[in-house]
């Protein structure tokens, strides 16, 4: 084909490509900025438990990409975020987790707070629940720190911190969500104890998943309108 004949075809290809790119950009912008609300009360506790178990494994195995993908799936399927928003929000969650993981003391851990604030600010703006973003972000970080420094805390401190986080998000009395906190803390304790003893087996992960399933089921019942 001569250059004269190719020129119109190349122009057509360029125009089609530009149109496709424009449509993709419009779709992304619509996804990001079109106002919509989602319910944080409507989730499948079994699926949340399955994904949280997977995320814990990815975190401790230092699998950043896998953790990001699991967080995206959780936000998209259980908290009803759109594909683009779920990726943006998951980035902040995963980044906060690994910033915290590298920390050695409270001043290091607090470097994760800006990403946690961005994470919860997105959820606040998308959810049908009005909560204090800064307070919730601080409570999230606080249970991370209590868990990391658990040898310096009483046995019930972690369960209480986990319950206080959900109480602040859902605007319910902390006593109503203590069972959630207790079961989730128990799952964490099993993971920590088994890791210190040489390794977490598949049977251990199954037990952890069961505790998390019961924990999230308890929360789902506690926060229903």
What feature does the model see in each segment?
Residues 14-33:
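Hydrophobic membrane-insertion alpha-helices, especially the h-region
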Residues 44-52:
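Generic helix N-cap/helix-start motif at coil->alpha-helix transitions
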Residues 51-54, 89-93, 186:
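TPR repeat positional signature
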Residues 59-60, 97-104:
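Hydrophobic/aromatic side-chain positions at a characteristic register within alpha-helices
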Residues 60-72, 108-113:
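Helix-turn-helix repeat elements of alpha-solenoid scaffolds
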Residues 69-100:
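Short, charge-rich amphipathic alpha-helical segments embedded
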Residues 113-195:
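Extended amphipathic alpha-helical interaction segments
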Residues 200-225:
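A cross-kingdom marker for long, charged
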């Amino acid at each position: 084909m001569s250059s004269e004949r190719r020129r119109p075809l190349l122009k057509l290809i360029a125009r089609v490509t530009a149109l496709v790119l424009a449509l993709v950009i419009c779709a992304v912008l619509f996804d990001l900025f079109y106002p919509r609300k989602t319910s944080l009360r409507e989730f499948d506790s079994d699926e949340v438990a399955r994904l949280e178990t997977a995320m814990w494994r990815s975190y401790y195995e230092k699998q950043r990409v896998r953790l990001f993908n699991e967080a995206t799936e959780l936000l998209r399927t259980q908290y009803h975020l759109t594909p683009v928003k779920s990726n943006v929000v998951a980035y902040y969650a995963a980044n906060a987790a690994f910033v915290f993981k590298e920390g050695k003391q409270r001043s290091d851990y607090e470097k994760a707070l800006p990403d946690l604030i961005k994470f919860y600010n997105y959820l606040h703006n998308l959810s049908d629940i009005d909560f204090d973003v800064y307070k919730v972000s601080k409570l999230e970080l606080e249970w991370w720190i209590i868990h990391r420094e658990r040898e310096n805390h009483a046995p019930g401190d972690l369960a209480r911190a986990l319950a206080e986080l959900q109480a602040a998000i859902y605007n319910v009395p902390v006593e109503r969500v203590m069972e959630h906190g207790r079961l989730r803390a128990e799952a964490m304790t099993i993971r920590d104890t088994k890791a210190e003893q040489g390794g977490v087996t598949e049977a251990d992960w199954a037990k952890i998943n069961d505790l998390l399933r019961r924990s999230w089921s308890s929360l789902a019942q506690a926060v229903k309108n």
